[in-house]
Curated annotation (Swiss-Prot):
The keyword Membrane applies. The chain crosses the membrane at residues 23-43, 265-285, 288-308. It is a multi-pass membrane protein. Residues 1-22, 286-287 are cytoplasmic. Contains three transmembrane domains, including a tandem transmembrane domain insertion into its glycosyltransferase-A fold. Transmembrane domain 1 functions as a signal for Golgi targeting. The conserved DXD motif is involved in enzyme activity. This is GPI-N-acetylgalactosamine transferase PGAP4. Glycosylated. It is found in: Golgi apparatus membrane. PANTHER family: POST-GPI ATTACHMENT TO PROTEINS FACTOR 4 (PTHR31410:SF1), TRANSMEMBRANE PROTEIN 246 (PTHR31410). Keywords: Disulfide bond, Golgi apparatus, Membrane, Transferase, Transmembrane, Transmembrane helix. Disulfide bonds join C132-C136, C144-C194, C332-C333. Its EC number is 2.4.1.-.
Length: 403
């Protein structure tokens, strides 16, 4: 008499045969401990990790960020109030040159009082230019004030030290009477004005357009020097319309509709997989080489890097300017954009042909022009600026948050 054995019973019987020393059990335990215990404990406060506990930390981290920004804003204000000027009138923050190699144009509006965003940005650029020394003699700071009211205190203070272009100086304040011009179109027009003013005033080789809530990273000038003088001489990078220096960290994960990142992700697995396999085989005293084990560690490392956060692994590239990567740009966002002079003139023509509105801001307009005009654009990774503005100049935000 034969008795049938159920699939569940057969599975249990096979599981009982597995010993704690078997490869399958060890790798299963490693997976559970890594993704169920160690990684969540280590990463629950990392803002751009899948393990981040938003409900536990976000509100407090946002408040701490705002408080720190207030302190840094006050420090930047004192920095300029105490900054001496030669003969009491000659600016010392910038060194005038007949034709600068790079103009750094900072676009500013009157934002939330107390944070002094534009002062933070300009003071950081000033410090970095001083540290850079003779290598940055061809760099020119330029402030573009697009605030319609005359109450922009920070812009007035900076005018003692930095050349300023005021879009609405000496004009009638009748902008609000035109119902066809919304805030998104105005932002685009402001951008066009500042880019055009930079070209007309200095005729530089490059224009770096920086919004007044984008603080430069410490490595920005050595990296730009390397990129523009070495990397952008490569044929596939020549004649680019623009180079983005910032992409939101929350959009830097591998699981994104960008093919280049998928290739990079697979490359991470192919690099770390064999290394982890060798370590496992050595310490587990396993003879020979196992393709299934290597495949496991390839997938294991890919999953770990994605869940911890690609953003944090990109930070390793800051070890050297040559390690920064340049990849095709996506549509969001425009805190810092570098334009070669010929491309900047093409951009002015392109932007004059589009109209911006809610859902189609200047960043989307610039990105849409790439395909329409057959242009190319790139983004540098990791970011070369930090976005510190939680208060948008386009949207009211009474409860700002880091995410």
């Amino acid at each position: 008499m034969t008795t049938s054995t159920s699939p569940a019973a057969m599975l249990l019987r096979r599981l009982r045969r597995l010993s704690w020393g078997s490869t399958a059990v060890q790798l299963f335990i490693l997976t559970v401990v890594t993704f169920g215990l160690l990684a969540p404990l280590a990463c629950h406060r990392l803002l751009h990790s899948y393990f981040y506990l938003r409900h536990w930390h976000l509100n407090q981290m946002s408040q701490d960020f705002l408080q720190q920004s207030l302190k840094e804003g006050e420090a930047a204000l004192h920095y300029f109030e105490e900054l001496p000027s030669a003969n009491g009138s000659v600016p010392i923050v910038w060194q005038a040159t007949p034709r600068p190699w790079l103009v750094i144009t900072i676009i500013t509006v009157d934002r939330q009082p107390g944070f002094h965003y534009v002062l933070q940005v300009v003071s950081q650029f000033h410090r970095l230019l001083q540290q850079c020394g003779p290598q940055c003699e061809g760099h020119q700071l330029f402030l573009c004030n697009v605030e319609r009211s005359v109450s922009h205190f920070d812009a007035k203070l900076l005018s003692k030290y930095v050349p300023v272009a005021n879009r609405y100086e000496g004009t009638e304040d009748d902008y609000g009477d035109d119902p066809s011009t919304n805030s998104f179109e105005k932002e685009k027009q402001d951008y066009v004005y500042c880019l055009e003013s930079s070209l007309q005033t200095y005729n530089p080789d490059y224009v770096l357009m920086v919004e007044d809530d984008a603080i430069p990273e410490e490595q920005i000038f050595p990296v730009l020097e390397h990129l523009l003088r070495a990397r952008f001489s490569e044929p596939h990078l020549q004649d680019a319309l623009y180079l983005k220096l910032y992409h939101p960290e929350r959009l830097q994960h591998y699981i994104n509709p960008e093919p280049m990142r998928i290739l990079e992700w697979v490359g991470v697995g192919m690099l770390l997989g064999p290394v982890l396999t060798w370590i496992y085989m050595r310490f587990a005293c396993r003879p020979g080489f196992s393709w299934p084990v290597m495949l496991f560690f390839c997938l294991y490392s890919m999953g770990l890097v994605e869940l911890v956060g690609r953003h944090y692994f990109l930070e390793l590239r800051r070890l050297s300017p040559s390690l920064y990567s340049v990849v095709p740009a996506s549509q969001c966002c425009t805190p810092a954009m570098l334009f070669p002079a010929p491309a900047a003139r093409r951009t002015l023509t392109y932007l004059s042909q589009v109209y911006c509105h809610k859902g189609f801001g200047k960043d989307m307009a610039l990105y849409s022009l790439l395909r329409a005009k057959g242009e190319r654009a790139y983004v540098v990774e990791p970011n070369l600026v930090k976005h510190i503005g939680l208060f948008s100049s386009l949207r009211y935000n009474f409860h700002p948050s880091l995410l």
